[in-house]
């Protein structure tokens, strides 16, 4: 399907209509199969979410199985597609490893992979730069690259707070 995502007057709009996100985080973990999630379990997850009036899901903290996005497209769940970027334990101050040059390529490539492989899914309404790491030049470069490829979706990043690298203020906890 087609859709237009925009932010006007601090309101998220999809196809010109205000959207109240009632979302959940989802890890690819199955109570029976561990890290192997069957298509049947994915469908069960979607049906439970729909029954609970959940309209959005964040793929935390990595891209999910490609079939998950196809199901979200089919069943009408909005998706925040999160890049495989997690830096717990690296700190959040100016000395954080995530701000250093040795992480620049990794942060950029993980965001590039996320956008390049998932771009055509209409369920994806937000790109996420990653989870809980410190803001800085590496994330600025990742955001700039995403915007060079796709200006049609807002960019989210939980630790950015109200900084320049997130179009949405969306504290997770």
Question: For the regions a protein language model found, what residue spans apply to each?
Answer:
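N-terminal carbohydrate-binding accessory modules
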Residues: 1-49, 70
């Amino acid at each position: 399907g087609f859709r237009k995502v925009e932010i006007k007057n601090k309101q998220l709009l999809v196809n010109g209509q205000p959207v109240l996100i009632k979302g959940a985080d989802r890890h690819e973990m199955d109570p029976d199969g561990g890290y192997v999630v069957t298509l049947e379990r994915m469908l069960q997850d979607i049906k439970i979410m729909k029954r609970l009036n959940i309209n959005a899901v964040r793929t935390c903290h990595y891209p999910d199985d490609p079939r998950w996005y196809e199901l979200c497209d089919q069943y009408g769940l909005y998706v925040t597609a999160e890049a495989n970027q997690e830096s717990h334990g690296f700190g959040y101050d100016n000395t954080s490893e995530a701000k250093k040059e040795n992480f620049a390529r990794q942060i950029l490539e993980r965001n590039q992979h996320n956008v390049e492989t998932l771009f055509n899914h209409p369920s994806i309404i937000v790109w996420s730069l990653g989870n809980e790491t410190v803001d800085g030049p590496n994330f600025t470069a990742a955001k700039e690259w995403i915007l060079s490829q796709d200006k049609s979706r807002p960019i989210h990043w939980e630790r950015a707070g109200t900084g320049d690298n997130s179009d949405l203020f969306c504290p997770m906890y």
